[in-house]
């Protein structure tokens, strides 16, 4: 099956990192795998993150996180927001773009 998409996303090969702080104040470092421009369809952008310290499951899979964000007026990235579980169109688009990105990484 061939994946095609018309979403702009960053193919940055230099890893970028972000620190997330949970509700208990614990900091965790994540690598930014991909950013996705969803402005035209959903009015926001998305980022997919992978923990820098991770363990693969028995199938060799790694959990990743996805968040939405809207750029601030000054062009800087705004706060990360959780994507509602029932936002099926958003999740479908993120999954399609992420899978295409991963396919490209394997080539």
Swiss-Prot record:
Classification via InterPro entries: UPF0473
Pfam families listed in its UniProt record: DUF1292
Highest taxon of the lineage: Bacteria
PANTHER family with a match to the protein in the record: UPF0473 PROTEIN CBO2561/CLC_2432, UPF0473 PROTEIN CBO2561_CLC_2432
Family, per entry: Belongs to the UPF0473 family.
Protein name: UPF0473 protein LL0144
Native species: Lactococcus lactis subsp. lactis (strain IL1403)
């Amino acid at each position: 099956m061939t994946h095609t998409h018309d979403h702009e996303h960053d193919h940055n090969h230099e890893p970028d990192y972000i620190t997330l702080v949970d509700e208990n104040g614990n900091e965790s470092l994540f690598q930014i795998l991909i950013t996705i421009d969803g402005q035209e369809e959903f009015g926001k952008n998305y980022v997919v993150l992978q923990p820098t310290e991770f363990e693969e499951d028995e199938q060799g899979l790694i959990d990743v996180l996805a968040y939405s964000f809207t750029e601030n007026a000054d062009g800087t990235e705004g706060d990360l927001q959780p994507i509602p579980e029932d936002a099926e169109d958003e999740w479908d688009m993120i999954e399609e773009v992420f899978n295409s990105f991963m396919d490209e990484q394997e080539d």
